[in-house]
Amino acid sequence: MQIDKNGIIKSAQLHDKDVGSIQVQVSLLTSQIKQLTDHLLANKKDFISKRGLYAKVSKRKRLLKYLKHNDLEAYRNLVKTLNLRG
């Protein structure tokens, strides 16, 4: 199962050339986390992927914390859009 990276970027970008903003990074990480979660449900003993999942969750958590501290409105919109707890 491949991630539609361009579609995710287009849905989260702030302007036409935006590919690295916090919103885009969190959106990409969220899709990767969902994909890894599905993979780990089928492959319970894949500890390397589990470690990668934890790293991605940790990075997303740091980025969301940064966004919440610097732009609360953008944080709330992103959490609502991605259906994340917040």
Swiss-Prot record:
Annotated Gene Ontology cellular component terms: cytosolic small ribosomal subunit
Molecular-function GO term, any one: rRNA binding
Highest taxon, organism lineage: Bacteria
Protein name per the record: Small ribosomal subunit protein uS15
Species per Swiss-Prot/TrEMBL record: Mycoplasma pneumoniae (strain ATCC 29342 / M129 / Subtype 1) (Mycoplasmoides pneumoniae)
Subunit structure as annotated in this protein's UniProt entry: Part of the 30S ribosomal subunit. Forms a bridge to the 50S subunit in the 70S ribosome, contacting the 23S rRNA.
InterPro entries noted in UniProt: Ribosomal_uS15, Ribosomal_uS15_bac-type, uS15_NS1_RNA-bd_sf
A biological process term (GO) from this entry: translation
Biological role stated in the UniProt entry: One of the primary rRNA binding proteins, it binds directly to 16S rRNA where it helps nucleate assembly of the platform of the 30S subunit by binding and bridging several RNA helices of the 16S rRNA.
UniProt family annotation: Belongs to the universal ribosomal protein uS15 family.
PROSITE patterns hit by this protein: RIBOSOMAL_S15
Keywords from the named record: Ribonucleoprotein, Ribosomal protein, RNA-binding, rRNA-binding
